[in-house]
Amino acid sequence: MTEARESAGPQALRAPGTPCWVSLMAHRLTATEEFYGELFGWEFRPGPQQLGPYVRALLDGREVAGMGQLPPENRLPIAWTPYLGSDDVDRTAEAVRLCGGTVAVGPLDAAEAGRLAIAADPSGAVFGIWQAPAHLAPAITGVPGTPAWNELITFETESVAKFYASVFGYETEPVVSAGFDYVTLCVDGRPVAGVHGVGHGLHRDQGPYWATYFEVADTAETLRQVTGLGGRIVRPAHDSPHGRVATVADPEGAVFSVVQDPH
């Protein structure tokens, strides 16, 4: 999980299909900045305003994520959205439509940040597509406070993994295990994201969604911070092959996971 991004160089982080950015749309942008600033040590500066107020989060002066403000009348779920890299957003958006997905926003230009679109797969899970300009440095990864992994939580993996493979050219590696429905999405042999089929374990009122994992130095301390800052624990800390993991929600309800690198 964390090692997949730590071992990737700048060019690999830009390869088509690779998660290259995460963005959160919230109603109370200032309060959201305060929460994540305290939790991860992020600072903020203005970003592209094409879709409304938007800031870029920085860690040690390098970009790590983005946050935008939803209009008060917009009742969309508050959620972290991963952006998958593309060398031609318009072509990728057309592939999304041809393969049964939908494109809700764009493609559109985002000033110096490049070109983007926001789409959904056939099951309804929302993701972004980003064509970054060559001069733009990739987001920082591999240290606490940065995205470590992205995972699609859905009903079953077979059909949805085919969709993403068709659109982005992923190689797919199913996990062979009774009762565990999981597919790893790879680019040039490198794991970049996962698809986890949970069947009826998925809340019907939520639907399939992309989950974002952030690396932390100490999972237990992070959970204490989350609750102290007004967030809540969704799934308590537990050991995994990739480190100690927990799932939490920020004060507006955006769910994300944190993982402590075991190395």
Residue ranges and their predicted role:
Residues 41, 62-65, 84-86, 103, ...:
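Short, low-complexity, polar/charged sequence segments that are solvent-exposed and flexible
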Residues 32-34, 67, 77, 92-94, ...:
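Short acidic, gly/pro-rich beta-turn/loop elements at beta-sheet edges
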Residues 29-31, 64, 74, 89-91, ...:
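Generic "edge-of-domain/loop-turn" microfeature
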Residues 1-14, 18-27, 55-57, 72-95, 99-148, 173-190, 197-202, ...:
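Vicinal oxygen chelate
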Residues 2-3, 9-16, 20-62, 98, ...:
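Core segments of cupin and vicinal oxygen chelate
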Residues 58, 68, 130, 151, ...:
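Residues in well-ordered beta-strands of folded domains
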Residues 48-141:
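Active-site-adjacent scaffolding segments
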